[in-house]
Amino acid sequence: MQLLDGKITSDQIKEELKTKVEAIKAKGGKIPHLAAVLVGDSGAAVTYVNAKVKACELVGFKSTLVKLPETITEADLLAKVAEINADKDIDGYIVQLPLPKHIDEQKVTEAISPDKDVDGFHPTSLGRMVLNLPTYLPATPYGIMQLLERNGIETSGKHCVVMGRSHIVGSPMSILMARNTNPGNATVTMVHSRTKNLKELTLQADILIVAIGKPEFVTADMVKEGAVVVDVGIHRIDDATKKSGFRLLGDVKFDEVAPKTSYISPVPGGVGPMTIASLLMNTLQAAALK
């Protein structure tokens, strides 16, 4: 068993980006600028956004954090989105999800200019991805593709089972893995909460990508010997023995599944850092298009 270490792989990407930014600076070009919109102060969201801002600084990007109160109206948030769309200095931005219940996430996502949609959630971005046209790929699936490619995982002709069908991970992941690209060219099966023969299908997976949002759902008896397992889940579980008061778990029961695998991504330190690296790659692309 080998670890698909997202921290090591994302650090490689950040070093490459840092070199590119230094070259842009040397030529007197525009430094890529990523903005993040944070509504409210939920602990997990603050942690994610701070990690994104820190990563920007590390590679030499300019970053802006827009903090808004949880009580903000939908209209005021949409006005802020329109303002960022019009800001010529900002190359790309994200609106950190989830948003408070009184705000329509889809409406906000669709209000983001596709040119600045570095999270890759806008219908235009997703449509272009399906057609294999140049676009911003959704950050987490893009990060997983990079993790597979940079660790030399063969995907062509393999059976890839994607657990979960969200538009953020599961659906785009299944499309990317089936495309005539490298990585890609896999035979893809998507399973979800209504799948009747779940275990039968997961046991056929050469590559198992798990994004179902249930802590430690995937157990050793669901995974075939030598499979590649990518765990997208991340859950905060209360733990009084930890200084932070919680521990992080994935969707896969790591300790019992890991010995059966050829490669497995840990939680934390697997997909999470790769999502941030992909966001930076998309932002550099956005800046280059200007």
Swiss-Prot record:
Job description of the protein: Catalyzes the oxidation of 5,10-methylenetetrahydrofolate to 5,10-methenyltetrahydrofolate and then the hydrolysis of 5,10-methenyltetrahydrofolate to 10-formyltetrahydrofolate.
CDD domains xrefs: NAD_bind_m-THF_DH_Cyclohyd (cd01080)
InterPro entries to which the protein is assigned, alphabetical: Aminoacid_DH-like_N_sf (IPR046346), NAD(P)-bd_dom_sf (IPR036291), THF_DH/CycHdrlase (IPR000672), THF_DH/CycHdrlase_cat_dom (IPR020630), THF_DH/CycHdrlase_CS (IPR020867), THF_DH/CycHdrlase_NAD-bd_dom (IPR020631)
Superkingdom as given in the UniProt entry: Bacteria
Protein name stated in the entry: Bifunctional protein FolD
Record's GO cellular component terms: cytosol
Source species taxonomy: Bacteria, Pseudomonadati, Bacteroidota, Cytophagia, Cytophagales
Species of the source: Cytophaga hutchinsonii (strain ATCC 33406 / DSM 1761 / CIP 103989 / NBRC 15051 / NCIMB 9469 / D465)
GO MF annotation terms: methenyltetrahydrofolate cyclohydrolase activity; methylenetetrahydrofolate dehydrogenase (NADP+) activity
Family of this protein: Belongs to the tetrahydrofolate dehydrogenase/cyclohydrolase family.
Catalytic activity entry: (6R)-5,10-methylene-5,6,7,8-tetrahydrofolate + NADP(+) = (6R)-5,10-methenyltetrahydrofolate + NADPH; (6R)-5,10-methenyltetrahydrofolate + H2O = (6R)-10-formyltetrahydrofolate + H(+)
